[in-house]
Amino acid sequence: GIEIINEPNTTTSWPMMNVTERYKAVDPELAEGTGPIAFDWLKDFYVTAYHRLRDADKGALPTDKAVVFHDGFDIEQWKDFMRGSDGRLAPEFENVVLDTHQYLMTAEMMGCPQTVEGYDDFVRNTYAPMIAEMSEYFPVIVGEWCLFNSVGCGVDTHGGQSVLNGEEGAQAETLTAEQKRSLYQGVAESQLAAWSKGSGFYYWNYKLLTDTVNTPGWIGWDAWDLGRCIAQDWFPSRSSPSLVTATCRAVTMGPRGAHTMD
């Protein structure tokens, strides 16, 4: 299949991410007037894109290939999208998948306490029911997720900001190896259980190029690297074998780490 556009920055995510401060413009004059995407516009864009992709006169994408659309960081905006008069998916839309990207750093921006207990509670009581509910409207994939969080970094990352954003990372580890293992195994278990309520999930990323051990300010960022997470035993062996197997299969399945979707 094909995803129409990745991570459109909408009226929900723009203020939450504080985009113009997080990502400073190289050319401020050229960037002047930049702003978020409205959901009404985005929905029209997706419908137009869908019909063009399925257009038989233009080498149509066959219906056995999914058309994927990203939620714009607001998954509940899509309950009435592509619906017919009966409230079901309109017959003109076939094999459509909703992509949502869910991170603990985003949970922190939404007020999740930066504690092991806080992460577990947020994932189980916010993310899990959210995925389950939206799966009644579309097949849902969690197209990006990882174990990264501020506790593992030893500092508040203010929503996943790094030295590249001007944030100063911890200069020394604040957790022992065993404490890190316990932290990450816990958030892995709760997230894997939550994502299993959807139709698939993809770890971001398989491999980082940054040397997080020998480069100052990057403590905790190795949690983005699936290979390092597996090597350091950060996935719980006590989880459902199918969930662990699905995640570990990513080593041979591709760069994001795919949980297969029927």
Protein language model features and the residues they cover:
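Active-site region of glycoside hydrolase catalytic domains
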Residues: 1-153, 193-203, 212
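Substrate-binding cleft of secreted/luminal carbohydrate-active enzymes
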Residues: 102, 125-129, 133-242
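Fungal extracellular Ser/Thr-rich, low-complexity intrinsically disordered regions
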Residues: 232, 236-262
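Feature targets compositionally biased, intrinsically disordered low-complexity regions
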Residues: 34, 58, 219, 253-256
